[in-house]
Regions:
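Noncatalytic, beta-rich nucleic-acid-contacting surfaces in large DNA/RNA-processing enzymes
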Residues: 1-391
Length: 391
């Protein structure tokens, strides 16, 4: 992202009508940063659509807003869910979702392993959530960090800190180096004349293998400063070197704290919606889950105490709805072979009092609600209420 035309500073090529640069920026190759450019990875999250739909449903049901606009949805978000206003220490949210092990599309907690870790660790804060999601990755899991972390959380008196500075920086993660920023802060606070810039450089150097001679020399220089600073602060040389070894060890899977907290904020927001607007969240969850996971999603909804009402030509809509606090109504869109035109025709012309009313209704356009559509409705048992004993 720059303030002037890209073609002035880098080569551009056309690929399928889209302008692209052949330059790369990633773990292995960095061609943009040396030239002073910043690359932004902008990723979409299906969870944000679920949140948007949930807020839309909340506005419709609880605030009498018939057709919420994007501005209406954003206003609700800003007043209720924005990080600056939401209560991040709501015990009900942690108790109802993360501690109780109840999951329904909760961001970052859709896998059983993450759910199990959260239930064992009993998170009580955003930092706790951030630590759990940072640990739940292949590197930390293979090293058994999850088990050691849970033990430390449940038995805090067993955690030993080298000194007050170490405790101050690692207390929030029960003595574990989980975030990359913790390594940088410890180097800065414990080392002798290690600037924040050098501490941040160390964070980067520790994650790289096969350093060139200049970078290796810089790393060793920081090591000597770190050990010297620790000794001045009453930490033995051996303890300082052991701590450095922890830096080396944990840097292999340390996670960026700002990234972890930002993602955990979304996890908490989804948990808040699931706690206080459960039916609206459940409907949005079922709407957004792909067909390949729909059956599992319905079972999750049932485990939350919901009854799934059968498909009904007169009451089912275009998306999942809740008829009351304990009943969810499946939409017509879940019927295989029933197209959008047929669904639109049904919703516009209903209610239908009987099969005859449906078949011989002069207002129904036959080419929209055709034989194929009627067959699909029958197979899905969506017309049971229209049947009498003759059928």
């Amino acid at each position: 992202v720059i303030g002037e035309g890209l073609d002035r500073y880098m080569p551009l090529i056309a690929s399928k009508g889209v302008r692209q640069t052949p330059w790369s920026e990633g773990q292995a190759v960095r061609q943009l940063e040396p030239m002073g450019f910043i690359k932004f990875d902008i990723l979409g999250l299906a969870t944000l659509r679920m949140m948007e739909e949930t807020i839309e449903r909340i506005l419709q049901r609880h605030h009498s807003v018939e057709s919420p606009t994007f501005e209406d949805i954003k206003k609700y978000y800003d007043e209720n869910l924005h990080p600056d206003v939401i209560n991040l220490n709501d015990k009900e949210v942690y108790k109802n979702i993360f501690q109780a092990g109840k999951w329904m599309g909760i961001f970052q907690f859709t896998e059983k392993g993450a759910q199990s870790l959260a239930k064992r660790a009993q998170p009580k804060s955003i930092i706790d959530l951030s630590a759990i999601t940072s640990i739940y990755r292949p590197g930390p899991l293979s090293a058994g960090v999850d088990k050691a972390y849970v033990d430390a959380v449940n038995e805090p008196l067993t955690v030993k800190y080298e000194n007050e500075i170490v405790e101050e920086i690692t207390r929030e993660t029960s003595g574990f180096l989980i975030f990359q920023e913790q390594i940088a802060l410890l180097a800065n606070r414990l080392g002798k004349d290690i600037s924040l810039d050098d501490a941040n450089l160390l964070r980067k150097l520790l994650t790289k293998k096969g350093l060139d001679p200049a970078k290796q020399a810089k790393k060793e220089e920081i090591l000597h400063k770190f050990v010297a600073g620790c000794i001045e602060k009453g930490i033995s040389k051996r303890a300082a070197e052991d701590m450095w070894q922890k830096f080396e060890y944990f840097s292999g899977y340390g996670f960026n704290k700002s990234h972890a907290v930002a993602y955990s904020m979304i996890s908490y927001q989804t948990a808040w919606l699931a706690t206080y607007y459960n039916a609206e969240w459940a409907c949005a969850f079922l709407d957004k889950e792909p067909e390949s996971r729909k059956e599992a999603a319905i079972n999750i909804a049932k485990s939350w105490g919901y009854t799934i009402k059968p498909l009904n030509i007169n009451t089912s809509g275009r998306r999942w709805t809740s008829s009351n606090k304990s009943t969810l109504v499946a939409p017509l869109t879940t019927i295989k072979g029933l197209g959008d035109a047929a669904i639109d025709e049904i919703i516009e012309k209903r209610p239908f009092m009987s099969v005859e009313d449906l078949l011989f209704n002069k207002g129904v356009v036959a080419r929209k609600l055709n034989k194929k559509s009627l067959d699909a409705l029958t197979r899905a048992s969506a017309m049971e209420d229209l049947m009498d004993e003759r059928f």
